[in-house]
């Protein structure tokens, strides 16, 4: 009993989500064929074969059943990384996160210390006219800067048009290679990315090729989209050791009526709801209303924290990547199958040379492997 209590206490300590990873296992480019990445299949821990490591993403065709609902995140990564010039001609890098008000947008800056309030910036491109920006304020939560853009940049559509002309795809810092930007503009997007607004890819979806999606549909698997614009809440490093009161930065989520109606229908059958990626999990779980004990369509900012102890209302299974140590994504997956089991599976993945992080291999958490739901 004391051991169980100690384990539960460790579930809420950040250091309990750390692990050692050989840097050579960090993928710098994706699999040449999306559905050819390696796949670890996680089953019920009481089964003799509770973990399969000799599979590929294309084997998901054998895992999903006719009538199962597979939910994908259709957000599209914007070219949200901008290089701006100071008065002294030195460059500063901005990562556009979200609109604050009017034409003012919250951006992460590198190096941020150079961007004092009212400092003027210039946005340049060889083929476009110069644009003047100004530092409008400092955000205490993120350490970012509020940047005033031209007066017409007041919505996601107008910002996306500007970013298409001046910006670059914001790859994670651990992806280091000599590929051209055009390579990542395709490879760092899912095949179904149609809704611009993300500053990072929902990477589990990178494993789904057009042919795999087509074959799943032919089998009778239902595939529907939600939207969660991946932002600071997904990739921000956790900076507190005590996770009991953890808060995440808000992100925009949209789950429409068609998806909600399908959730309600599926829950009355023996079919399962499979989320493609942790962002799809958070979007789906956010559409459950505790007030009315039912599922509802939503279109709003959400900062749902899923960690050990969370009881899943919607999701039965998950396709996900292998995530960074001490990340909120590790907490979410631990809530599904338990922290200790997850870390043991990561040890196994490392031993068998699975590739990690955004361009890496995948893990499928099957419905029978989840901890008890309520």
Curated annotation (Swiss-Prot):
Pathway: tRNA modification; tRNA-queuosine biosynthesis. This is S-adenosylmethionine:tRNA ribosyltransferase-isomerase. One of its GO terms (biological process) is tRNA wobble guanine modification. InterPro entries: QueA (IPR003699), QueA_dom1 (IPR042118), QueA_dom2 (IPR042119), QueA_sf (IPR036100). It is found in: Cytoplasm. It is an enzyme of class 2 (transferase). Transmembrane segments: none annotated. It comes from Prochlorococcus marinus (strain AS9601). Keywords: Cytoplasm, Queuosine biosynthesis, S-adenosyl-L-methionine, Transferase. Monomer. Belongs to the QueA family. Its EC number is 2.4.99.17. Transfers and isomerizes the ribose moiety from AdoMet to the 7-aminomethyl group of 7-deazaguanine (preQ1-tRNA) to give epoxyqueuosine (oQ-tRNA). One of its GO terms (cellular component) is cytoplasm. Pfam families: Queuosine_synth.
